Amino acid sequence: MTMLRAGANITGYEIREDFAERAKKNVKAALGEKALDRYDVLIRDAYEGIEEKDFDRMVLDLPEPWSVVPHAKTALRSGGIILAYTPSIVQAAKFKEALEGNGFALIETMEVMNRTWHIEGQAVRPDHRMVAHTAFLTHARLLST
């Protein structure tokens, strides 16, 4: 949404028509009808290939992002950035391995979690319980090919 708000053109791949329609409705609700001029959701499977070229950025939220890396290599422009959300560190490690074997560099993985804090007067500490779901974000940059 932030990129659309800033004026970027966004192309998404979705294998389910109902999810594609939901995505468009969400964009319209958040940014208005005009934003849909720059937002395109294609009914395609990224595992089978990516036809478009010269993407600046690619964000992956799917079970096996490492399977898309060879396609991303041809779809991203030189210096383009790829990012994947993975719920497990094993997935993040497999994704990193695929990136290393396909010309990507500056690879970094970070864990994302949410922890609340107790702040009352001078008593400042993390809450005793943390009910959280962690996730891992791995990003890299495509080197010149």
Q: Would you name each region that the model predicts?
A:
Residues M1-G7, K73-T74:
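Conserved SAM-binding loop of SAM-dependent methyltransferases across substrates and taxa
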Residues M3, V27, L99:
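Short hydrophobic alpha-helical segments of the AMP-binding
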Residues G7-Y13, I82:
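Short beta-strand element of Class I
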Residues N9, R38-D40, A105-E108:
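Conserved beta-strand segments of alpha/beta enzyme cores
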Residues Y13-P65:
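S-adenosyl-L-methionine
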Residues W66-F136:
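C-terminal substrate-binding/active-site "lid" region of AdoMet-derived donor-dependent transferases
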Residues A140-T145:
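C-terminal lobe and adjacent flexible extensions of AdoMet/dcAdoMet transferase-like proteins
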